[in-house]
């Protein structure tokens, strides 16, 4: 039988999702733990690779087991969480059809990138402190319009990546202010004017993503927010640009895979 896993992980302790020969990965930790629990070798297939330091709050994976599990799904979830490192949490174990595939069956993936514009020790582990004092988020959201639709996004793809196509379809992309959950105990006040909020996130969803794509998009939109480039520059990048023409990639620790839809 095939089972799906819904899980979260802190990317700081891993080289990413995919197994690497000489570095810890989320996939390796899950396979090792499941194999010990079920007393057979278990292979886990994930919704896609995430890079070093990148986190996930809504990751989906699947594994196969010959027959019924030796204990209930809730018990397996409990035992997994007891054995896994604190950086990985399994939220559910669910039986799925045999043709369910965590990677190839996914029709939409969502990423969220967090930034803050003032020093804050409570969010620094999962948010990038953007050092530019002024960012025009209206211009950045205007630029997001040029990302929507089906395009070749090789201008945001890590160079040297071996993929068959760089074409993706982006369904939504926007910036929005937010209030961190610890803000209620932090000794600071958020302005009632959204534009002055020090805390923002960028959300983007697509049918697929290229390696380093989201971080390169965020870095390019920051250039628009700084006033170094116009919103229309993003349109030109997508149409004719190369990776060298786009903005620098922002750090990976503030990026989350937040949702996978099937």
Predicted stretch roles:
Residues 1-262:
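Structured-RNA-binding interfaces characteristic of tRNA pseudouridine synthases
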